A protein has these predicted regions:
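Active-site-adjacent bridging/hinge elements
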Residues: 75, 79-80, 84, 127-129, ...
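Extended non-transmembrane interhelical loops and adjacent amphipathic helices
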Residues: 22-27, 149, 182-187, 191
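Extended, well-ordered alpha-helical scaffold/bundle regions in very large, multi-domain proteins
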Residues: 107-113
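Short pre-active-site segment immediately N-terminal to the catalytic Zn-binding motif
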Residues: 140-148, 152, 159, 196-213
Length: 213
């Protein structure tokens, strides 16, 4: 799925808030969903999931294969279920998982109340998934470049000591970080390393406060 999602799938273009044709990518999809223009949010959401729908047979087969693989490994390793096997990697009892689900279900009314409040604040008759990400208050519009973010980070983490700050600065200035989104690049943000090398960070930076945090 990861290869299909990051390398093979291409999303269409839609008009942004300014009427400019912009191609949707994994990296900028959230920006469309945060738009104050509901039509932009709706168009972006439908464009992305219509694209995924074109690969539904491939995805269904991939999911089926993953389920069969998980069940096979659980069986040969003498686990009662694939769930028990998956949780065992982190030494988590199944009771903890069950309690988590039970607690979430118990407090669903609070989530429903939040959705009702969101509907009221946004002035909507009905809330759709693409309405869940747009801010309830006006964005400050503050833009933060990657270079500015580096300065904020170095200053903010200075209390951790000179050695920490020195290693952080070395990584930021010596290509330990793959910053910007690119075609075929994995979506999201990750850090990984191998024995004998410095760690590497993969991200898809956008000039906003959320990315700074």
């Amino acid at each position: 799925f990861s290869v299909l999602n990051n390398a093979d799938i291409t999303f269409p273009s839609i008009k942004d808030e300014n009427g400019k044709e912009t191609q949707i990518t994994h990296g900028n999809f959230i920006n469309f969903l945060e738009s104050s223009n509901r039509e932009v949010r709706k168009n972006a959401f439908e464009a992305v999931y219509k694209t995924y729908g074109q690969y539904k047979n491939t995805m269904a087969t991939t999911l089926s294969g993953t389920v069969k693989k998980d069940n096979f490994y659980a069986r040969v390793k003498k686990y009662k279920s694939a769930r028990e096997a998956a949780l065992s990697n982190n030494s988590i009892p199944e009771e903890v998982y069950d309690n988590l689900i039970k607690t979430i279900n118990k407090h669903l009314p609070l989530l429903h109340r939040y959705i009702d409040l969101r509907k009221k604040v946004l002035g909507l008759d009905e809330v759709h998934i693409y309405d869940l990400y747009t801010p309830l208050v006006k964005d400050s519009g503050m833009k933060v470049t990657y270079e500015e973010a580096k300065d904020y980070m170095l200053k903010g983490l200075a209390p951790l000591g000179e050695e920490y700050a020195s290693i952080l600065k070395e990584g930021l200035e010596n290509r330990w970080v793959d910053i910007y989104e690119n075609k075929g690049k994995r979506s999201g943000a990750y850090s990984s390393g191998t024995y004998g090398t410095n760690p590497y960070i993969l991200m898809n930076w956008h000039d906003n406060v959320n990315n700074l945090f």
